Amino acid sequence: MTHASLHGSYRRGTDRRLFLLAATALVLLALALADLATGPSGMPLDDIFKALRAGPFYDKSRSEVASRALALLPAAPAGLESLWQGMGEFFGDEARLRKLVTILWGLRMPQTLTGILVGFCLGLAGLQMQTILANPLASPFTLGFSAAAGFGAALAIMFGGMMPGVAGHAWYGFIIVPAAAFAMTIGACGLIYLIAVLRSATPAILVLGGIAVLFFFQSLQSLLQFLATPEASQQIVFWLFGNLLKASWTSVAVGLATLVLCLPFIIRDTWALTTLRLGDANAMSLGIHVDRLRRRSFIIVSLLTAAAVSFIGTIGFVGLIAPHMARSLVGEDHRFALPLAAVTGAVILIGASVIGKILSPGGAIPVGIITAVAGVPMLFGIILRSGQRSAA
């Protein structure tokens, strides 16, 4: 093949990958609008756009000024009847718009944005973990990070229930419980990282360490549920479901800050991670320090996972399925696989949120349940496809 034909083939492949990435992003945008529109009180698209244009800091003083002006009008002169009626309609529209702004920006927007950011984090973390461990079944969920977060949250809920008047405060559920889950996730990752430093950071060492962490924290979690009061046990179970109803603007800020912190390192290691898919020997022959790359990627995965699960609870299968879907579409090139895995993770999570709201309009089914139910057949498909490749 000539240089021109090779360059043309490369450009066609790149254009195809960019098209798939753009198409997936459009699907995510459509699902995000659907997620904003669904809920106990339906919201048509034109109302959504009205509330979006009004913004989160909608100026309520305009209606207050207008109401004072209305109070100064004469009782009901014949010439002002139409004006009176028009201002009454104006106030009705103002009140309705304030309600729309409250629902959209105060309740639904934080949940949708948190779902997108959590999907980004889990998709990126899952692809990096499968790459550094050379294991198609590796994910933040299967290696115990989510179990560690669940134990941290259960610990905070249980001890909060022992302190009268503390657990009932809103700040406890929005700050202390997520902080405990975040800290425990980082602690679990630190334990596995320490094992990798003391030994070599081989995939086998990291996988065995992750499995040990998974069973350890699951057993501690079960012990806490056994010892907890019925009220605390119910709160623990609700947290473990994985629910976007727990999202807030705080979870949006933490998720966004974590992504901004980790993305420069992820982008820098893109070529190294792509090369690592060829095997350790090939990567080392090209000058890549494999152990250092694995340890650095493991730290990034721990931060992404901690930010993802600390606020909304355990979300299974997203970090496992999204990387496989991304690689099946764009291949092993991490320049395209990483962003597509992130967007695909968000598509799965927001899609699960929409399905949960449609199936149970009064109270949305937790997304953790939807992703688990949908993830099982996908996992079987991955296993069967891997078996066919091995046989071939």
Predicted ranges, named:
Residues T2-A392:
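Alpha-helical transmembrane segments in inner-membrane proteins
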